[in-house]
Amino acid sequence: MDAHAATLLRVSLAVVFIWFGILKPLGYSVANELVERTVYWFDPGWFIPFLGWWEVLIGVTLLVRPWIRVAVLLLLLQMPGTFLPLVLLPDVCWVRAPWAPSLEGQYIIKNLVLISAAIAVGGTVRPDIRRGRDLPARPPANV
């Protein structure tokens, strides 16, 4: 399982970002109204498609191993904004703050998993640094 975990996590993240991202410029994302109400200072006519294509770019860069660092950077720049509705739209995001999020609030809070997964995937870029150059990747089987 360990041999494929990072690849599966990376591809899964890519699928989510490409899929959910492309829905925004096409006008099919259930999050479009939430985005529009949250960042009301931007014209949604250009901002929602821009955000969608940004997410697609995150997904595509996750699929190309040498670009993983770019993907993580793009994701970390984008993700803080996804939490804004929890503060700016409490009537939409909470049934009873801070313990009972609405469906929209749950949709936002699950982004913690996406951030953590991206950090885990980013950690696979240079495993020799994480483990030390002279250490074996795994302990011997008889230990």
Give, region by region, the residue ranges found by the protein language model.
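Membrane-interface extramembranous regions
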Residues: 1-143
